[in-house]
Curated annotation (Swiss-Prot):
Record keywords: DNA replication, Nucleus
Keyword Metal-binding annotated: no
One cellular component term from this protein's GO annotations in UniProt: alpha DNA polymerase:primase complex
Descriptive protein name: DNA polymerase alpha subunit B
Effect of disrupting the coding gene: Delayed cell divisions/cytokinesis. Dysfunctional development of intestinal and pharyngeal cells. Mislocalization of p-granules to the nuclei at the 4- and 12-cell embryonic growth stages. Loss of cell polarity during cell divisions.
Protein species of origin: Caenorhabditis elegans
Gene: div-1
Family from the record: Belongs to the DNA polymerase alpha subunit B family.
Length: 581
């Protein structure tokens, strides 16, 4: 998204001024809303925030700061609207084409307007030591900020289950250590979705969820037609969509419609003025509603029925597992040294976890170094050499490594979600036994523990789109609520339309959840967190390379500590840590 807000980056920019923004959900939600409304990024509004905080003499962002910020941004927007068209910015001097360096010619279009102040090669720090040995592109400059970072290995957050014990964690286990992929794999081809098959799959999914809702709520005896004018109460179900007559309005309470599960895909507008309970809606959500349609124009909804999460499968009680997770990018956006990944692998060699999960992007399209004229290898060769380095570094360990691409940012896969695993050519074929290549999303099982992973940022996408109304809104855990949608909707990406280009046929087939996973690794740009939700634990480690530092996650599971009792989850017997690299 062009107008994103990232709390960690925002605080990094505020830190030099001695200011900070607390990681409170309603603050984050407000700042995200301001960025989207005024078409700015988090970095764009830093100066405005600093100005407001300096004027008010405050060190920490609060509701008053945000209110004043919104007032200032609104004033700026009005000023822009009323600026006469005849007032033009003075033209900047242009550099004649013959005088432009190769660096400028190969850069962004904006670079031709800027004088070149880049450092000479002799002033650029070079990779050294094991960072040089590890880098798949030895000609990359070093990341000096990473080498000088503060608080390496600092624990950002910890969750310790009430029955977790360190004792016996490294002991032998009788359970099967084989990783079994239980989710479907998308096609390596794309663009061949048949409309009739997609419609049939959507209709079947709506019917399945409606059946689960009906089983959970005895008052729903039968489904009716909500488009027929009547004073009688009707129960119906369907998919939440943005009212097509209000496309110019932001998705919300007054721009919601329901697409009915009939042959015509009938759309009925919904009015929630009679609703007294909490409302949570997003496009693509499948719900049931109760209401009346006296005029035939819109359904006056007085109750919403949400499906419950699927049950969690049992696990083997003698299981001990150390699972690590990291999400790309794995190097800074202006180099190709992969120092962050090298450092992580050094820790893996030292501590030897059972599983290391690495989610993309590996070759990031946002990496500006890949556009430099000095970068003279193909993206595929860069990926191949990087994964070979990963394999070589972990020789002698028993750590199983899982590799997952990111369709929206990895340059070595088609930009279509769900994403098939990286294609293995001759180089990668040599290491297919050492590295496990999986799709995005993927669910696998080991010793009965079901683990889901995705790099597509569904929770971030829901955060950008979801409408929620509650009398107790400030005291509700927003991230937990967003995470719960994946479980109740039985889908690893329940938002429709998606924020990433998608194959609807594969999405409906591959993203389905047959049971609630015990663990879900779903990184986002939101603040790092670990949340227990509906019998599962959602872990957001953020990214491994983020400015001068980054984060990764460790999870230790010890079911030798006792037998899993009814109502308990794997999280009760686990310790989760999110650490800085």
């Amino acid at each position: 998204m062009a107008y994103e807000f990232d709390l960690e980056d925002f605080n990094d920019n505020l830190e030099p001024f001695g200011f900070n923004c607390p990681a409170k959900d309603h603050f984050i939600e407000k700042l995200e809303g301001l960025c989207k409304t005024f078409r700015k990024s988090g970095e764009d509004i830093v100066d405005d925030v600093v100005s407001v905080m300096s004027n008010l003499g405050q060190k920490s962002v609060d509701s008053g700061i945000l209110a004043k910020l919104e007032e200032n941004l609104e004033a700026q927007a009005q000023k822009t609207v009323h600026t006469p068209r005849s007032v033009k910015k003075p033209a900047r001097g242009r550099v004649p084409l013959a005088e432009k360096s190769g660096f400028i010619l190969s850069g962004d279009p904006d670079d031709i307007e800027k004088p070149s102040h880049h450092l000479t090669n002799s002033a650029i720090a070079k990779l050294e030591g094991h960072f040089l040995d590890f880098s798949p592109f030895p000609g990359s400059p070093a990341n000096e900020k990473f080498l000088k970072r503060a608080d390496p290995s600092h624990v950002v957050t910890t969750i310790r289950g009430k029955k977790y014990q360190d004792k016996g964690l490294k002991g032998s286990t009788k359970s099967d250590d084989t990783i079994r992929i239980i989710s479907k794999t998308p096609s390596t081809l794309y663009g061949g979705d048949k409309s009739s098959m997609v419609i049939e799959a959507k209709a079947q999914r709506m019917a399945d969820i409606a059946h689960r809702i009906q089983k959970s709520f005895e008052e729903i005896v039968d489904w009716g037609n909500p488009s027929i004018p009547s004073v009688d109460v009707v129960y119906t179900y369907g998919q939440v969509i943005h009212d097509e007559t209000k496309d110019n309005e932001k998705f919300g309470e007054h721009s919601v419609a329901l697409m009915i599960n009939d042959e015509d895909g009938t759309m009925i507008r919904m009015d929630f003025s009679k609703m007294t309970e909490d409302i949570t809606l997003f496009p693509g959500q499948i719900i049931a509603v109760r209401g009346t349609n006296e005029t035939g124009e819109e359904l006056q909804v007085d109750k919403i029925f949400q499906p419950a999460a699927l049950p969690v499968n049992p696990v083997e009680t003698d299981t001990t597992k150390e699972i690590w997770f990291a999400c790309g990018p794995y190097t800074a956006t202006d180099n190709c040294g992969y120092e962050h990944l090298c450092e992580l692998l050094d820790k893996v060699v030292a501590e030897k976890p059972d599983i290391l999960m690495l989610a993309g992007p590996f070759v990031d399209k946002k990496n500006t170094f890949l556009n430099k004229p000095t970068f003279n290898i193909t993206y595929d060769n860069l990926l191949e050499d990087l994964l070979l380095k990963v394999k070589e570094t972990l020789v002698g360990t028993k750590t199983q490594v899982i590799i997952q691409p990111n369709a929206s940012r990895d340059l070595c896969v088609p930009p279509v979600f769900p994403s098939a695993p990286f294609q293995q050519n001759r180089k990668l074929d040599k290491i297919k036994k050492e590295l496990i290549f999986v799709a995005d999303p993927c669910i696998f099982r080991i010793s009965g523990v079901e683990v889901a992973m995705t790099s597509s940022e569904p929770i971030q996408a829901l955060s950008n789109t979801e409408f929620h109304r509650s009398a107790n809104q400030e005291n509700i855990d927003r991230v937990a609520r967003l995470s719960s949608h994946l479980l109740t909707q039985q889908c690893m990406y329940p938002l429709e339309p998606t924020e990433v280009p998608a194959s609807m046929g594969d999405l409906l087939d591959v993203c389905c959840i047959g049971s609630t996973p015990h663990i879900v690794f779903a990184p986002t740009k939101l603040a790092p967190s670990a949340k227990c939700v509906n019998g599962s634990v959602f872990i957001n480690s953020s990214t491994l390379a983020k400015g001068p530092t980054g984060n990764y996650a460790k999870m230790s599971i010890n079911l030798n500590a006792g037998e899993l009792m009814p109502g308990e989850t794997v999280a009760d017997y686990a310790q989760i840590q999110i650490l800085k690299i």
